Amino acid sequence: MFKAIRRVFTMIPRIQLTEKETRICNLLKDYTAHYNSLHYGQEPLTLRITGGWVRDKLLGQGSHDLDIAINIMSGEEFATGLNGYLLEHFDKYGVKPHSIHKIDKNPEKSKHLETATTKLFDVEVDFVNLRSEEYTEDSRIPTTQFGTPEEDALRRDATLNALFYNIQQDAVEDFTKRGWQDLQDGVLRTPLPARQTFLDDPLRVLRLIRFASRFNFNIEAGVLKEMHDPEINEAFNNKISRERIGVEMEKILVGPNPILGLKLIQRTHLENVIFLWHGDQSVIEYNRKNWPQTKDVEDIYKKGIFNHHLKNFIHHYKDFLSRYLKLRQAIETKDKSFQQNFLLASILIPMADLKIIALPKKKLNNTLPVSESIVREGLKFNKASSIVVARCVENIAAYNSMVEKYLQSGDLKRSEVGTFLRELRGDWEIVHYVSLMDQYLKYISRKDNVVNIIDKYDRFWNYIQEQNLQDSDKMVPIIDGKRMVKILETKPGPWLGKINDEVILWQFDHPQGTEQELISFIKSILPNYLQ
């Protein structure tokens, strides 16, 4: 006879289902009843929605992640049976059976835990069996087997993520006995002792930090204390892929309260393993042996320079936003990648002017700014983000010099500013903010200087707008190459590219210039390039 499940229904509010969720649950209830009628006397099939969906619904938020745990069979077995049921009852539900995407067990990758995915009423649903897990010392990938609801709840990263919605009972189950209370209190607590939980799977540290920053929750004091453990830090570096770290960090950086996430990272001294300057140990070792700047890079971590900068940035960030409304408006109105890239560039200011050898086997052009390497190789973010972040960090000093030059001269040539902005490839605004942040952090102790610095940068910003230079990177010669060759009655050659550079400068300095005036200018300088 099957083992009875101890029910853990507490005074938790009923979940309000959407119309589509109701249809899905009604279908699953019907199929479950059908299955159990055919297997009378055996342990009944029970379905539970698990994870973030339950948490989000109880918080009154929408959720699109439907993960359904099954007690007596694999996800693939269940989905196959459900599809057969849909074939027989198409008239009742109007749902065509979909192909089942099976994700087999794979001990090398934690994301592959024998899950089956299909669609119900145009909603993607994952089915997986209830699991218990056993870890080894050298991997965060557990050995999994069928488990009870209690075992499945206890293996989760936080009690408030271990709440289950029993579909048949239309009720929330709290097998940890703390999940609902912790959700009400806004407390993140591990179901099992935190130290072993984190050693088993250090990614849980970063996940708790992400949930804290997303919901503005507190991490329970004892759990937070364990996050400081150097052994956890080491396990983090040894057990977790850079891609997994990057996924969590991206969610933190584009989330509603990234500064809280960064604060927790700084407090737990995880910045040295999260913002690693390269993810490939062989590249790291090569640089240590062959590249003198490697010591400078690693000293930034070892001597606490990075941690101190991160702490300083976090401490002053809100004050900076309150003083500089342009940045606040940009964060609120631009794509979320803007917030992510601004934060990353500001965090990585200490890495300015430092490079590493990124491609040891390549003889030429094999170096990369450390800031770009951290984003691309350490966090495994996309190439576009890594380039923008590096462009910001590597141009901090140059941008500040341009601001000072403009203020001292009072009347820079329009072409000088335009050419400089062209070099920033359309990213001048974010470079502006990061360079200003660098100056702000340097002079924050002297309040009068801070006001002065913001005023300087504002005046330069206004000059760019007044001179209509904000789209300098998009400027093209008003006479294209083919027409130019025809007008000048000469053959194309290397001179054409050089003339085009001169044309761009002329157009910057003559915003009202006519085509005829430009032709006269080109003819006047052409002999210099045809010699």
From Swiss-Prot:
For this UniProt entry, the molecular function terms from Gene Ontology, in alphabetical order, are: ATP binding; ATP:3'-cytidine-cytidine-tRNA adenylyltransferase activity; CC tRNA cytidylyltransferase activity; CCA tRNA nucleotidyltransferase activity; RNA binding
Instruction: Quote the catalytic activity from the record.
Output: a tRNA precursor + 2 CTP + ATP = a tRNA with a 3' CCA end + 3 diphosphate
Q: Where in the cell is it found?
A: Mitochondrion; Cytoplasm; Nucleus
Record's Gene Ontology CC terms?
mitochondrial matrix; nucleus
Indicate the impact reported for D67A.
Eliminates incorporation of CTP and ATP
Could you confirm whether the keyword Ribosomal protein appears in this record? no
Q: What is its EC number?
A: 2.7.7.72
Give the residue spans that cross the bilayer: none
Q: What is its main location?
A: mitochondrion
Q: Which top class of enzyme applies to this chain? A: transferase
What highest taxon heads this organism's lineage?
Eukaryota
Question: Which keywords belong to this entry?
Answer: ATP-binding, Cytoplasm, Mitochondrion, Nucleotide-binding, Nucleotidyltransferase, Nucleus, RNA-binding, Transferase, Transit peptide
Q: Does the keyword Mitochondrion apply?
A: yes
Biological process terms from the Gene Ontology for this record are: tRNA 3'-terminal CCA addition
Q: Which family does it belong to?
A: Belongs to the tRNA nucleotidyltransferase/poly(A) polymerase family.
Q: What job does the chain carry out?
A: Nucleotidyltransferase that catalyzes the addition and repair of the essential 3'-terminal CCA sequence in tRNAs, which is necessary for the attachment of amino acids to the 3' terminus of tRNA molecules, using CTP and ATP as substrates. tRNA 3'-terminal CCA addition is required both for tRNA processing and repair. Also involved in tRNA surveillance by mediating tandem CCA addition to generate a CCACCA at the 3' terminus of unstable tRNAs. While stable tRNAs receive only 3'-terminal CCA, unstable tRNAs are marked with CCACCA and rapidly degraded.
The record ties this protein, via PANTHER family, to: CCA TRNA NUCLEOTIDYLTRANSFERASE, MITOCHONDRIAL, TRNA-NUCLEOTIDYLTRANSFERASE
Q: What is this protein called?
A: CCA tRNA nucleotidyltransferase, mitochondrial
Report the source organism: Candida glabrata (strain ATCC 2001 / BCRC 20586 / JCM 3761 / NBRC 0622 / NRRL Y-65 / CBS 138)
Gene name, Swiss-Prot/TrEMBL = CCA1
